[in-house]
Amino acid sequence: MEGLSITKLLVVGILIVLLFGTSKLRTLGADLGAALKGFKKAMRNDDEVSTSVLGETKMSAETKTVAETKAASDSQAAASVERKD
């Protein structure tokens, strides 16, 4: 066995067309295309959800850091006011 040559592939293709018919193959192609389109859409939506969740996590971490910094500066300001008294 040498492998698949172009003539063998053509013979197999012709047999498939004769076996299933062009209308069945056209329907199969349309179904396959719709499935691929749905898969790509789902992957794109999954990426958008992951990005938004990652962004929210990053924003909450930044908010927490800002709140901690403000609390620390407020406590330092209160301590300096107590020292002045």
Curated annotation (Swiss-Prot):
Signal peptide: none annotated. Residues 64-85 are annotated as: Disordered. InterPro entries: TatA/B/E, TatA/E, TatE. GO terms for biological process: protein transport by the Tat complex. Keywords: Cell inner membrane, Cell membrane, Membrane, Protein transport, Translocation, Transmembrane, Transmembrane helix, Transport. It comes from the Bacteria. It is found in: Cell inner membrane. GO terms for molecular function: protein transmembrane transporter activity. One of its GO terms (cellular component) is TAT protein transport complex. The chain crosses the membrane at residues 1-21. Gene3D superfamilies: 1.20.5.3310. Its main location: membrane. It is a single-pass membrane protein. Part of the twin-arginine translocation (Tat) system that transports large folded proteins containing a characteristic twin-arginine motif in their signal peptide across membranes. TatE shares overlapping functions with TatA. Belongs to the TatA/E family. TatE subfamily. HAMAP family: TatA_E (MF_00236), TatE (MF_00903). This is Probable Sec-independent protein translocase protein TatE. It comes from Yersinia pestis.
